[in-house]
Amino acid sequence: MSAAKENPCRKFQANIFNKSKCQNCFKPRESHLLNDEDLTQAKPIYGGWLLLAPDGTDFDNPVHRSRKWQRRFFILYEHGLLRYALDEMPTTLPQGTINMNQCTDVVDGEGRTGQKFSLCILTPEKEHFIRAETKEIVSGWLEMLMVYPRTNKQNQKKKRKVEPPTPQEPGPAKVAVTSSSSSSSSSSSIPSAEKVPTTKSTLWQEEMRTKDQPDGSSLSPAQSPSQSQPPAASSLREPGLESKEEESAMSSDRMDCGRKVRVESGYFSLEKTKQDLKAEEQQLPPPLSPPSPSTPNHRRSQVIEKFEALDIEKAEHMETNAVGPSPSSDTRQGRSEKRAFPRKRDFTNEAPPAPLPDASASPLSPHRRAKSLDRRSTEPSVTPDLLNFKKGWLTKQYEDGQWKKHWFVLADQSLRYYRDSVAEEAADLDGEIDLSACYDVTEYPVQRNYGFQIHTKEGEFTLSAMTSGIRRNWIQTIMKHVHPTTAPDVTSSLPEEKNKSSCSFETCPRPTEKQEAELGEPDPEQKRSRARERRREGRSKTFDWAEFRPIQQALAQERVGGVGPADTHEPLRPEAEPGELERERARRREERRKRFGMLDATDGPGTEDAALRMEVDRSPGLPMSDLKTHNVHVEIEQRWHQVETTPLREEKQVPIAPVHLSSEDGGDRLSTHELTSLLEKELEQSQKEASDLLEQNRLLQDQLRVALGREQSAREGYVLQATCERGFAAMEETHQKKIEDLQRQHQRELEKLREEKDRLLAEETAATISAIEAMKNAHREEMERELEKSQRSQISSVNSDVEALRRQYLEELQSVQRELEVLSEQYSQKCLENAHLAQALEAERQALRQCQRENQELNAHNQELNNRLAAEITRLRTLLTGDGGGEATGSPLAQGKDAYELEVLLRVKESEIQYLKQEISSLKDELQTALRDKKYASDKYKDIYTELSIAKAKADCDISRLKEQLKAATEALGEKSPDSATVSGYDIMKSKSNPDFLKKDRSCVTRQLRNIRSKSVIEQVSWDT
């Protein structure tokens, strides 16, 4: 039993010091959460809104930096899964999951993204970029997420403890993993038999750990084959089974975290997707020594896999290369692009010896024979279950159309399926498919994922895989179970191999996506072979190994190969494209027309013409073997050679005739008409011969089918590739004819269906139009009835509600009249206030005019005083400067007195002038005050007048509206509108009243004060004088 079942603690609580261990039992979290139900019950420990960079964003590209980030709600669970969804509702399915148990580091992403508060979560699969709104949020997330890479790095340094094996019999999964680990790891101190996987998560981790251990020391290429060790069991496994395991091994080599990885999606298998492999191969360092394409083991695997390709042609969808003469051109490209790189690791482990001589130079290498015999000797020692072992998740369709996911295990000519891998350990079988009765496995289009069907005598079983690569691997593996490969008898196939080495044609491998980019830089010869493959991509993309090529293309390919020079040391030219053949034919027709135009004489038909018709371009035939008697294969070769060369007469004998005729010494020449008739006869004869040859071809095809049927049951030698190709070409012709018949029948059915569809559509359109017209008429009648009914109901309701409306209108009229009276009263008050303000304004204006008059008087008086002062000053000056003799004779006392009086008088005049200035300034201030008062009064008057005008207009509108409502009400009641009901307007002139007060007190007081002041000043001046 697994450790997870023995663990009584089912609830994981992180330890304070080690987050990957349980607080209760101190066991890893993988031993607690075993199924999806436990995953959904996990407790969230942190969450919040974050911004996620879109998938596939390359921040090194400036265009991608402007992409809009996606706002998602992130939740971190206690088992280490970071999930994000569109909202925070717990019922919302997450859009994605980041397994923090595989996280290698969490770093600041501002340098990469150019965005503040961003983080980069590094995992072996990809990089995830998240961003927060503030620094506090991103700091909290960084603190929570950094626990996982730190724990992973700590666990990397610790050596894992492996549980001892249980005494029960190990299942197929255990046998496969232990055997592969024992063959691939020789330097490990822990015995590989003890590495028994316990659960779904530990199985994957143990598989990766066994792949992580270093391989055996590779032998140098210079060592002889006798010194090399026999290949291990893992190296003898089929390439289709081994490729996925090596891919997972390569990915485990590059994993930074050493803790056990838990599969979150529940889909556990030894396969990986193409995207994962592509990313891993970019990180994988180049191999130390590339394998030589001409090693014996490589050639042995090529020849053996040709038998597999013949048996599982519909499943593999590819074409294998024959053993070519050139060592650089016979490199097998593999059955899919994903195996190109892992196969190199196989060859490095198998220690390739020195390169062998060319296959065309020597019929068969002794090393090759030794390797084949070595394989025969080592294969029985290998457990068949290990060679054919495969397991993984697939979905099965039941009879009711329901799909259910199962854990499938392929071994011992049966395909068993369980509920999950734990059920496999417990031998809890859900069902089994017997592959001994299986005769075919084909791809089948389904709605879910990538489907395929297993055809057995009992029935058909429909399954589906997650990816096309997984489906292809399953089909290939199942087909190998259906048609197991047997080691050929090398001794009995030596002469046939000689024939094959001299006349083999180069077939076209199936092109794979991005294969050339992954294989590194090839040598120049390999580049040329790839260029030939790229020229053939037009055909190879259209036709696979299971999709037969048309027989015309096969004949054209072999014809082009036969016409060329018979050089067996070079691969023959690939088949010409249809466009090139058309251009060649058009060119020949043009040359024929020109040469016929040059013929101006006729030449009688004779023996030369008969000999001429027999001149054809013959390509060198296939060399016959003198070592064996003529068997069925030799006869087929001869017949095919006749079929290949016969269609060339029709095109190639015509250009020879003008050349031959032009070499005549000016004799009689054929006319154009006679030459045309001869050519037509010759064409008919050629067609007759071609029909006879086609009949013979059909007979030979029947013989070939019988021979292939005999050889299928007990095949002990190599099969000539050219023979197989021709057999497939014949089957391809019949298949093409059937397809054409089916297409024509399908086209006829489509035309019938289109006509039926058009007829039904026309009938349906006519019926729809008539139904629409009937519905329109019915709708119109119904509308008319509804309108009459509604009018009657409205009239009755109006008659019943007229009295109520009349009372309501009267009440509203009375209320409006009351409001109007209130408004008129307010209006009269406003008018009265306006009149008072107007009177006050008039009084202010009068006071202003009075002030202006007083100001003028004061200005005149001031002018008079100034004049008097000037006269007095001049008089004083004349007194001071008038009589010099009098001054000399006068007494000093009189002079001093006069000077004092003059000073006093001058001071008095100055003080009077100062007072007058003050008076003028005070008058100016009063004038400005009066002007401000006037402006304020006029503004207030305007505002009040505007308000009164608005109120009057509003009242008039209300009165007119109420009159109209009243008139409408009286008309509805059937009464005449009351002419006497008129509301008298308010006369603004009537409300004006002359006020009996005037603001004259202030002006009188100021005027009296001014008079008093002016009198006192005049008296003082007169006294001083």
Swiss-Prot record:
Residues 546-824 are annotated as: Interaction with RHOA. The keyword Phosphoprotein applies. It is found in: Cytoplasm, Cytoskeleton. Residues 43-150, 387-483 form the PH domain. Residues 284-294 have a biased composition (Pro residues). GO terms for cellular component: actin cytoskeleton; cytosol; focal adhesion. Residues 152-302, 317-383, 485-545, 560-591 are annotated as: Disordered. One of its GO terms (molecular function) is cadherin binding. Residues 179-189, 217-236 have a biased composition (Low complexity). The modification Phosphoserine is found at residues 192, 217-218, 220, 224, 226, 265, 269, 289, 292, 326, 362, 365, 493, 619, 663, 800, 891, 977, 993, 1014, 1016. Residues 824-879 are annotated as: Interaction with PPP1R12A. SUPFAM superfamilies: PH domain-like. The modification Phosphothreonine is found at residues 295, 348, 646. Residues 673-977 form a coiled coil. Residues 2-383 are annotated as: Interaction with F-actin. Keywords: Actin-binding, Coiled coil, Cytoplasm, Cytoskeleton, Phosphoprotein, Repeat. PANTHER family: MYOSIN PHOSPHATASE RHO-INTERACTING PROTEIN, PLECKSTRIN HOMOLOGY PH DOMAIN-CONTAINING PROTEIN. Targets myosin phosphatase to the actin cytoskeleton. Required for the regulation of the actin cytoskeleton by RhoA and ROCK1. Depletion leads to an increased number of stress fibers in smooth muscle cells through stabilization of actin fibers by phosphorylated myosin. Overexpression of MRIP as well as its F-actin-binding region leads to disassembly of stress fibers in neuronal cells. This is Myosin phosphatase Rho-interacting protein. The gene is MPRIP.
